Amino acid sequence: MAMTAAQKAEIVKGFQRAEGDTGSSEVQIALLTARINDLTPHFKANTKDHHSRRGLLKLVSRRRRLLDYLKRTDAEGYRALITRLGLRK
């Protein structure tokens, strides 16, 4: 199911660096992680849905690129974020 505006606002509030920050790498990664986690159960039930799986893989690769950027620019923030989100390195 799609993420509601309230859920999105809650995620932004939890990961923003300053008031009104919606575009920092941390916020974008957290939002992508929430979307990925929402889509994952769909593929357990619908194993042949390859069209949507491609969209999921695009989200995962976008998150990976943002994580690589964050690791390059702010290594300590990267480590803190992956532990908060429960991601592997």
Swiss-Prot record:
Keyword Transmembrane helix recorded: no
Name of the protein: Small ribosomal subunit protein uS15
GO molecular function: rRNA binding; structural constituent of ribosome
Protein keywords: Ribonucleoprotein, Ribosomal protein, RNA-binding, rRNA-binding
GO BP term, pick one: translation
Function noted in UniProt: One of the primary rRNA binding proteins, it binds directly to 16S rRNA where it helps nucleate assembly of the platform of the 30S subunit by binding and bridging several RNA helices of the 16S rRNA. Forms an intersubunit bridge (bridge B4) with the 23S rRNA of the 50S subunit in the ribosome.
GO cellular component assignments: cytosolic small ribosomal subunit
RNA-binding recorded as keyword: yes
Cited Gene3D superfamilies: 6.10.250.3130, S15/NS1, RNA-binding
SUPFAM superfamilies: S15/NS1 RNA-binding domain
HAMAP family named among the record's database cross-references: Ribosomal_uS15_B (MF_01343_B)
Pfam families noted in UniProt: Ribosomal_S15
Gene field: rpsO
Quaternary state and interactors: Part of the 30S ribosomal subunit. Forms a bridge to the 50S subunit in the 70S ribosome, contacting the 23S rRNA.
Disulphide-bonded residues: none
Protein family per UniProt: Belongs to the universal ribosomal protein uS15 family.
